């Protein structure tokens, strides 16, 4: 007799997250911002210590470990960023993070500039969302328009004169020109000319 069924009675069934997709996007984007700010701060410290080593020629970093002051954005700015993050659709979260990382790699900003870059990336994502929504609305309008069948399709305007009615200069020249000499193997079928 197996004990596995007896051991399973105490297991809790797996629960799905009670968070909405908007909350998950908000949390993901804000975690990305915090992580990138820590990374930029670490890179700045490394650059400063490298410059200090070059200037002084001595490395005392092993001797004393100074407390690291961390930069944090203001609560008002954090709330504004959270508000913008909540408007981002989940499908735009990944591309926004990739664009943010790309801008950080290209520009190597100071810690104070990271939040501003993040806001600009979020604004780009919102603009792209609006453009795609407008395009989707236009395609929906075109797809919902009533269509006439091809059997009831009639041309409303006729182009006149038709190409066969238009006289060209080459036709006038050909009428006044003498007929080309005929070859002996071909009979000549012409009406006699009345002069």
From Swiss-Prot:
Quaternary structure, from the entry: Monomer. Interacts with GUCY2E; promotes the exit of GUCY2E from the endoplasmic reticulum and its trafficking to the photoreceptor outer segments. The interaction with GUCY2E negatively regulates its activity. Interacts with GUCY2F; promotes the exit of GUCY2F from the endoplasmic reticulum and its trafficking to the photoreceptor outer segments. The interaction with GUCY2F negatively regulates its activity. Interacts with GUK1; up-regulates GUK1 activity.
Locations listed in the record: Cell projection, Cilium, Photoreceptor outer segment; Photoreceptor inner segment; Endosome; Nucleus
Pfam families: RD3 (PF14473)
Region (Disordered): 168-195
Keyword terms, alphabetized: Cell projection, Coiled coil, Cytoplasm, Endosome, Nucleus, Sensory transduction, Vision
Lineage, highest ranks first: Eukaryota, Metazoa, Chordata, Craniata, Vertebrata
Basic and acidic residues composition bias: residue spans: 168-177
Entry GO CC: cone photoreceptor outer segment; cytoplasm; endosome; nucleus; perinuclear region of cytoplasm; photoreceptor inner segment; photoreceptor outer segment; rod photoreceptor outer segment
UniProt KW ATP-binding keyword: no
Coiled-coil region(s): 22-54
One GO term of the biological process aspect: negative regulation of guanylate cyclase activity
Organism: Mus musculus
InterPro entries, alphabetized: RD3
Associated pathology: A spontaneous mutation leading to a frameshift and in an unstable truncated protein lacking the C-terminal 89 amino acids causes retinal degeneration. Homozygotes mice (called rd-3) display retinal degeneration, beginning at 3 weeks of age, characterized by complete loss of photoreceptor rod cells by 5 weeks, and cones by 8 weeks.
Annotated protein name in UniProt: Protein RD3
Tissue note: Expressed in the retina and in particular in the inner nuclear layer, in rod and cone outer segments, in the outer nuclear layer, in the outer plexiform layer and in the ganglion cell layer.
Function: Plays a critical role in the regulation of enzymes involved in nucleotide cycle in photoreceptors. Inhibits the basal catalytic activity and the GCAP-stimulated activity of GUCY2E and GUCY2F, two retinal guanylyl cyclases involved in the production of cGMP in photoreceptors. Involved in the transport of GUCY2E and GUCY2F to their target sites in the photoreceptor outer segment. Up-regulates the activity of GUK1, a kinase that also plays an essential role for recycling GMP and indirectly, cGMP. Plays an important role for the survival of rods and cones in the retina.
Top-level lineage group: Eukaryota
């Amino acid at each position: 007799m197996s004990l596995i069924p007896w051991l399973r009675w105490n297991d809790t069934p797996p629960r799905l997250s009670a968070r909405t997709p908007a909350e998950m996007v908000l949390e993901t984007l804000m975690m990305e911002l915090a992580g990138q700010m820590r990374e930029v701060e670490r890179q700045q410290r490394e650059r400063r210590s490298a410059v200090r080593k070059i200037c002084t020629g001595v490395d005392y970093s092993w001797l004393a470990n100074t407390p690291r002051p961390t930069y944090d954005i203001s609560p008002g700015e954090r709330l504004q960023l959270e508000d913008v993050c909540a408007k981002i659709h989940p499908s735009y979260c990944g591309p926004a993070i990739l664009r943010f990382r790309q801008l950080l790699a290209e520009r190597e900003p100071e810690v104070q500039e990271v939040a501003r870059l993040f806001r600009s990336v979020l604004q780009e994502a919102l603009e792209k969302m609006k453009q795609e929504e407008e395009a989707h609305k236009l395609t929906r309008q075109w797809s919902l328009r009533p269509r006439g069948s091809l059997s009831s399709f009639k041309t409303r305007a006729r182009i006149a004169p038709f190409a066969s009615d238009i006289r060209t200069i080459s036709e006038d020249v050909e009428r006044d020109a003498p007929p080309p000499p005929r070859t002996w193997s071909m009979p000549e079928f012409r009406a006699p000319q009345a002069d």
